[in-house]
Amino acid sequence: MGFHWKKMLPELELAVLLCGSIAAAASGDNLQITVLVYNNAPVSVSALKQAEVEAARVFSAAGIGIAWVNCMQGSRTVSEACAHVPRSDEFVLQIAPTGKTSNDSVFGEAFLAEDGRGKYCDLFFDRIEDANLRFRTNISRLLGAVAAHELGHLFLGLNAHSKVGIMAPVWEQQSLREVAMGTLGFTGVQSKLMKARLEREQAKFISFRSRNGRPGDY
């Protein structure tokens, strides 16, 4: 899925367009995910770090920590730790320089399987940058909020939208103000669903380790 803004309306708003393809800074939270970041867009190191702080804030408020691994900056490989198939607690986020959808106002895309699960999402930086200029928000916070929304879809699936919060199908002026202030987040129900999923995955890992007598990947 991805965000898009309605060009013909006078209000400042962002809307969410479902584009799910059929085919999450470390904190003190007990539950944690790792997000492998491929920055293939002209996003500076400092702007990316601030965006990661914002996305981590959103997830931390839901009781989930994020460990970021910056795999690529432009054409330069930053970390070799990304050269593996993502485990169950790992997700891959690519910041692409330009959009890859036919609708040029879509801001990103989460790739979901038929069961609503996924590991990969893309953000389209040129469109986010354009929206930032039009809406006069903070580019790092907007980038981080869009990242949190797309990662949220990887947790919550195709039917993840809510009337309020970061997973709302439409971001109107109040939501944009919350983005600018760094207060937009998941609902309580969404937080519980995401934590329950991680707890199930952890339980599977512990069971696997006890049966096999070795750590293994999960």
Region locations from a protein language model:
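Bacterial N-terminal signal peptides
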Residues: 10-21
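Metalloprotease/metallohydrolase-associated module, dominated by Zn2+-dependent proteases
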Residues: 36-53, 113-137, 141-142, 158-218
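Metzincin-family zinc-dependent endopeptidase catalytic domain
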Residues: 45-154, 160
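Hydrophobic side chains within alpha-helical segments
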Residues: 14-16, 153-156
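Hydrophobic beta-strand segments of well-ordered beta-sheets in folded domains
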Residues: 29-36, 66, 89-92, 164
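Boundary at the C-terminal end of the N-terminal hydrophobic targeting segment
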Residues: 24-28
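N-terminal secretory signal peptides that target proteins for export/translocation
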Residues: 1-8
